[in-house]
Amino acid sequence: IYIQIIEIVDNEGPEIVCPADFSHTTNGHHCTADIWMPAAVVFDNCSDLVTVTVAYPGGFGNSNGGFYATLPVGANIITYTAYDECYNSSQCTMTITIQDLTPPVPVCDDHTIVSLTLGGQSGLTKVDASVFDDGSYDACGPVTFRARRMDSCIDFDWTTEGAGIDEIHNGVVDSRDRGTVHRPKVPFACCDAGAGPIMVELEVEDASGNLNYCMVEVNVQDKIKPIITCPSDITISCDYP
């Protein structure tokens, strides 16, 4: 009689299939998203009990999904690990992409007064768009500014013969020259002085390219002293005429 010992060994990890990749937007006032983690599909030929853990940026879960995870903006790699009763393990990964689709919050000055600063025919002033800001912000980072006039002095010569603005150097006045498209600076000239409030639209952009807008009233003042040129000296005879 011979005794034969046959040992059955399980060296294979469970089969695990991760959920499909997906995208989600950030929460309204935070640069993160609270995601309900989905469950992976797991199966093992030898074990009835398979445990799953989930690792994600900044955290760890001891269950096969079924909990909320707070994820930052960007591509987040999620790792699922399945363990059978023989301590074999298998892994799979998925990607959850968090996008910032929330526009920034624009805050404008109610009213701005601009004084002309240059002499000559135009009295031109270019005002940085950021001057019209009064605390605009975005939950995910810094914002940038551009602005435009809502209308312009149509009869005023904004090219090199007047205000000296000709962005594409063609000698023709266009919307860029008049300041009616969003630019880093907004032009004002002597034709604006005393003309009443000029409406300016401030464009606020966040790092993800989301845009939002607010309006400012601008009054232009002409504080430039007039230029006077006296006639040449003359000599008049006492016998005149």
Task: Give the ranges of each region predicted by the language model.
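Proline-threonine-serine-rich low-complexity tracts
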Residues: 1-241
